[in-house]
């Protein structure tokens, strides 16, 4: 099992295995993470388990149907799951150990921070990934 937590350690979780990792450059993710790019690990729902602190989580609807979750104590963004996706999205920096996956692609590159240069050879998508429809266009996800 691979464990993770928020900065203060109140919200804790573990996963059996990660499915993928994505770099998201959308404005929402940049503002919510206070970084030029957000990195998410995606895990199948049945491979994710809360270990503690669920009662210490606040939610914010960052776009219609997309709820971001934060630790009430330290403010760290914590794992969240959109009802229309089969996975839980976890900010990669929350893991205590290597989640065992590496980034596979960039999404929303059309809104990337002007000071951020993409220097790798991973696929870049100006908006959303081609294999998902517009109904989930506001959520960072890769398969």
Where are these regions (language model features)?
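A short Gly-Trp-Pro
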Residues: 1-143
């Amino acid at each position: 099992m691979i464990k993770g937590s928020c900065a203060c350690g109140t919200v804790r979780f573990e996963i059996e295995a990660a499915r993928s990792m994505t770099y998201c450059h959308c404005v929402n993710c940049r503002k919510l993470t206070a970084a030029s790019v957000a990195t998410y690990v995606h895990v199948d729902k049945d491979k994710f388990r809360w270990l503690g602190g669920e009662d210490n989580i606040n939610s914010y609807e960052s776009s219609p149907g997309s709820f971001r979750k934060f630790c009430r104590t330290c403010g760290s963004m914590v794992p969240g799951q959109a009802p229309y996706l089969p996975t839980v999205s976890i900010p990669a920096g929350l893991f205590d150990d290597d989640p065992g996956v590496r980034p596979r692609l960039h999404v929303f590159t059309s809104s990337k921070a002007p000071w951020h240069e993409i220097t790798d050879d991973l696929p870049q998508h100006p908006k959303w990934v081609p294999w998902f429809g517009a109904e989930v266009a506001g959520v960072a996800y890769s398969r």
